[in-house]
Amino acid sequence: MVAPAFRVERLPRPLIFVLVTVLCVAGLAAAHGSRIVDNWHVTQWEDGVFFRYNVEQIHSLGDCFVKRGAWAGLYRPLTTNLYYYVVSQALANRIEAYHLINLVFVILNAVLLYRLAESFLGPWWAMIPAVLFASRLAMVEVVLHTCEFQGLLYVFFTILSVDLFVRSRKSDSSWPLTLSALAFWMALFSKESAIVLPALLIVYGWLFEDRIVSRRYLVHPGIAILWVILFVLVLRPLSHDQPTGFGYDFSVSNVLRNYTAHFLDFSNWFLAPLQDYVMPANVAALADTWHARLLFCVLITSEIAMLLFPGFLKTQGVRLAVFGFAWFLITTLPFAIFEGRLFMRYSYLGHAGLALCVGGLLESVVRVFFARRGKTETRADAIADVSLKPPLAR
């Protein structure tokens, strides 16, 4: 692999993670620093809803799991009831404490993405996805609103589950796979959108492993099926089968528009200067144009073609780019089918995939550039060597 002269892998592992953390903090500060300062003592309206519900309804640890959350139809005990109950008991609902927890998890998730990317790219190139993930303007609500801990924790457990699953391939112990399964359970109890994780692992196996028909690949689909049964028979009745209030539109036009908008809002250039925290009008308008949708259709078609013929993907970086875009498509799907809920915060986990995609593409481009330059220099040296020899020696 081509790498800069300074070799990060020579540093002690703890120091590497310190360096990555510093870079991610710098990226977060560059993107949201002034907004974080201005918002430090602010309680957003939905935060207040959770505070009041917790005070009125949740009086013990048991209540956290047997009572529904503030919003009907959803079961997220770890990130709604339990989270607010524990923090309220320990820190008396100080809004600054909640803001600090959000910031810690934003950085933690980026560092965790680094750990995953390192398995594919090595310690130097893996920094690119991590810093990109920490510095997206689109996650402004995730950074500023404490109620978005739901997204932060489910993203944490989802990335952790993928990372442990990837590492279980080279481990003689069953612990990585067991912990990956446990992390998947935790992700599901943080936010239902984690249900798509098994599809993500299957794509990983298709691209990076020789075979995906093995017991390892049955664990997470089995958990997903068990969770669906549990949700329908036990958890939904906690809300008396009340609807979530979400509308769904499965039309190709709606899904394609939502996908395109979530893809475009990965770019800070499209969002700056950031004024609308939900979804800037210019991004929504661009996603609604035929040429933007056509371009995204081309990307999806290319992705499908590369997944069908992975043998043509010769380098690890290219395969990671394909995996990253598939990650975006899979993890954004639960939100792409929403009607009238085009929110940038729904892009959060999908942007981790796009960050991996960018990292893989950059590594591949640099690899090709240096490989070609090396061949050119070798050829030039050979010609020069021949030209310097005396005629009788040629």
Predicted regions and their residues:
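Polytopic membrane enzymes that build or remodel cell-surface glycoconjugates and lipids
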Residues: V2-R394
